[in-house]
């Protein structure tokens, strides 16, 4: 959530910056609510001053033995008006809060201005795409003989679900373990296991609610009455970041660096017809997430570091990729600045997103009331960052396509072989060596 003082000081400036990311701030509605709020507060202060004055007057009158009934009646009327004003003020504050919760983050000044993904800016590339001397297959055709089973996934759960069997299931698990080991042993993250089901206030904290409720899977507890609806996490960013909600951490504890491997659940509302083939866009997929909670002055250095951590996974797997700075119109709701990593998929002859690393600055922290005690001993909002390190399913897709062989087998990347019992190649039973 944005700092409301920012809007009070420079409403037109904030409106312009939000317009850059495709959000139209209702300036008239905000201004009207603010004017009403100020009028009520001014009137309340006047009433308070009048009541204080009358209270002193009553004391003096009693000392002189005078009748105070008329003055006391006026004091009672003032009290009634102040109570009514307090109720009205609460209503206005609630409406302001609704407006603020719907507002996305303000883009950092370094973010390129653009309407959509076509105006993102490439920052760098790593690795040269492999030149194949045979017809390249996509991950569906490569993976199906190896245990990639969409038919059973659809039978069990419907479209956009997958069953993995045998060697391909093992390769998927190896990828997740490799990512976790790299982040914990080389990058300084603490491995964390969190619930996959969370309460609504947790989703308000990281910005999924109220705006993106249709993208979430809701769950209800069976056999219980009057229970609050809960949600399956769409990313473990949600649970990891909220571990510091409603708390004040010591400055000495920063940065807090957390990582988790979890399934993620997304309804993919609005994605009808997109990426219907294969594992690119699923309702359930695994991801290794990175989260950092840092002091404000350290957050942009932390963003660069986090991008580097995601890059290290791709480099170690020897998968070609590029880093892209997202433009204002393509950034996520909570982000002030985002870099995407896009991996090369030879069957599509293009780069596809495999990681997104974002600095939300104090946007999520304000919603969560996550603070630290600064050098002056005063509570101050932390900055929160999140990044995929990486999406496991999409990394599996990239390995299948980039490491495929003419005979239908797939070479196991060197970095994954210790997690595969030394296996160097996976193949369908009929073509296994």
Swiss-Prot record:
GO cellular component: cytoplasm
Domain writeup: Consists of two distinct domains, a catalytic core and a N-terminal extension that is involved in tRNA binding.
Family per record: Belongs to the class-II aminoacyl-tRNA synthetase family. Type-1 seryl-tRNA synthetase subfamily.
GO biological process, any: selenocysteine biosynthetic process
UniProt subcellular location: Cytoplasm
NCBIfam families: serS
Record PANTHER family: SERINE--TRNA LIGASE (PTHR43697:SF1), SERYL-TRNA SYNTHETASE (PTHR43697)
Keyword ATP-binding annotated: yes
Encoding gene (name): serS
Residues reported in the UniProt entry to bind L-serine: 235-237, 289, 388
Primary localisation category: cytoplasm
Swiss-Prot/TrEMBL catalytic activity: tRNA(Ser) + L-serine + ATP = L-seryl-tRNA(Ser) + AMP + diphosphate + H(+); tRNA(Sec) + L-serine + ATP = L-seryl-tRNA(Sec) + AMP + diphosphate + H(+)
Protein name: Serine--tRNA ligase
Classification via Pfam families: Seryl_tRNA_N, tRNA-synt_2b
Pathway the protein acts in: Aminoacyl-tRNA biosynthesis; selenocysteinyl-tRNA(Sec) biosynthesis; L-seryl-tRNA(Sec) from L-serine and tRNA(Sec): step 1/1
Binding site for ATP: 266-268, 353-356
EC numbers: 6.1.1.11
Presence of keyword Transferase: no
Enzyme superclass (EC): ligase
TM stretches of this protein: none
SUPFAM superfamilies per record: Class II aaRS and biotin synthetases (SSF55681), tRNA-binding arm (SSF46589)
Task performed by this protein: Catalyzes the attachment of serine to tRNA(Ser). Is also able to aminoacylate tRNA(Sec) with serine, to form the misacylated tRNA L-seryl-tRNA(Sec), which will be further converted into selenocysteinyl-tRNA(Sec).
UniProt KW keywords: Aminoacyl-tRNA synthetase, ATP-binding, Cytoplasm, Ligase, Nucleotide-binding, Protein biosynthesis
